[in-house]
Amino acid sequence: MNIKDHIRGVPDFPKPGILFYDISTLLAHPDAWQVAMGRMAREIIKFQPDVLAGIDSRGFLVAAPLALKLGCGFVMLRKKGKLPGETIRHDYALEYGTDTIEIQKGAIEEGKRVVILDDLLATGGTMAAGVELLRKIGAHVTGAGTIIDLAFLPGKQRLKELDVPFTCLASYDE
């Protein structure tokens, strides 16, 4: 099964000139979603994770079912102000400003092996921020994964510079 057959391209979203790759169509087809999660599980297990960290919000859709399949813990990396209780944060630069990603204090024990997951890798800014946050709390980031990689953007290179191996199911060159 070709996973790309179940990913819809939406032109001019969220703004003109952008082609948005939408996993909603993949999620809507249980057979395709099952195949996708099985393939991801076979790749992610190679990173020997204790915990899977999903990036807000579509990363939750990838990390949570994989955590169940692999018998790992699951934690959420969220935008500022979305998690209850005490959090640890990491501020990072955007093209025009800054943003913040947070994790609940105590969500991951120091030294645990963590794989960070999202639906799509583009510039790698949010994924890199997640890696930095996880390292800040003492986690060992053993890998990263997404359903989609926009190979024409620098996300993979950014992860390579952070010494984080990366895997994906579908790569797009434009």
UniProtKB/Swiss-Prot annotation:
GO MF terms held by the record: adenine binding; adenine phosphoribosyltransferase activity; AMP binding
UniProt cross-references to InterPro entries, sorted A to Z: Ade_phspho_trans, PRibTrfase_dom, PRTase-like, UPRTase/APRTase
Subcellular location per the Swiss-Prot or TrEMBL entry: Cytoplasm
Pathway in which the depicted protein is active: Purine metabolism; AMP biosynthesis via salvage pathway; AMP from adenine: step 1/1
Enzyme class: transferase
KW Transferase (keyword) present: yes
Keyword set, alphabetical order: Cytoplasm, Glycosyltransferase, Purine salvage, Transferase
Catalysed conversion reaction: AMP + diphosphate = 5-phospho-alpha-D-ribose 1-diphosphate + adenine
Chief subcellular location: cytoplasm
Subunit structure: Homodimer.
Function: Catalyzes a salvage reaction resulting in the formation of AMP, that is energically less costly than de novo synthesis.
UniProt protein name: Adenine phosphoribosyltransferase
Organism encoding this protein: Paramagnetospirillum magneticum (strain ATCC 700264 / AMB-1) (Magnetospirillum magneticum)
